[in-house]
Regions:
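Short C-terminal tail/terminal secondary-structure segment
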Residues: 19-22, 96, 107-120
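Short, flexible catalytic-loop segment of classical short-chain dehydrogenase/reductase
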Residues: 18, 35, 53-67
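Residue(s) in the substrate-gating loop at a strand-loop-helix junction
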Residues: 14
C-alpha cells in the first residue's frame, strides 16, 4: 500500500466497543482500542491515499446469536429500532463500500451496522 500510495483498510469492531456490556470488559476494551488505533492510523496514512475505517456490527444473525434463548433474543430485538437482527451480508456490503473508490474521501470513521440500536 505504501509503495502504491493507495489502499483501503477496514477493521471490524463491535457495538460493545461503544456501549460496553455486562461481563465483557475485556472484549469492550479491545474493540474500543481498535477504533482508537484506526483513527490515529487514518491521520497518519491519509496523505499516502490510504483510508482506514471501521465497521461496527450490532447483533447479527449467526451461529452465536442462534444460541441465544428466544426470550432474551426478543428483548434484544425490541431494543433495535428496525426490530430485527442484521445479516452477514449487511456487514459485508458495508465493508465492500468502504473498500471501494466510492468511499475514497472517508477515513477515520466507524460505520455502525446495527439497525439503529446504537446511534453514535
Amino acid at each position: 500500500m505504501l509503495k502504491n500510495k493507495y489502499g483501503r483498510i477496514v477493521k471490524i469492531t463491535s457495538i460493545v466497543g461503544h456501549t460496553g456490556n455486562l461481563g465483557q470488559a475485556n472484549y469492550a476494551a479491545s474493540k474500543a482500542a481498535i477504533i482508537g488505533m484506526s483513527k490515529s492510523l487514518a491521520i497518519e496514512y491519509a496523505k499516502k491515499n490510504i483510508t482506514i475505517n471501521c465497521v461496527s456490527p450490532g447483533f447479527i444473525q449467526s451461529n452465536m446469536t442462534d444460541k441465544i434463548v428466544e426470550s432474551i433474543k426478543a428483548v434484544l430485538t425490541s431494543r433495535i429500532p428496525m426490530s430485527k437482527l442484521g445479516t452477514g451480508e449487511d456487514v459485508s456490503n458495508t465493508v465492500a463500500f468502504l473498500s471501494s473508490d466510492a468511499a475514497s474521501y472517508i477515513t477515520g470513521q466507524t460505520l455502525h451496522v446495527n439497525g439503529g440500536m446504537y446511534m453514535g
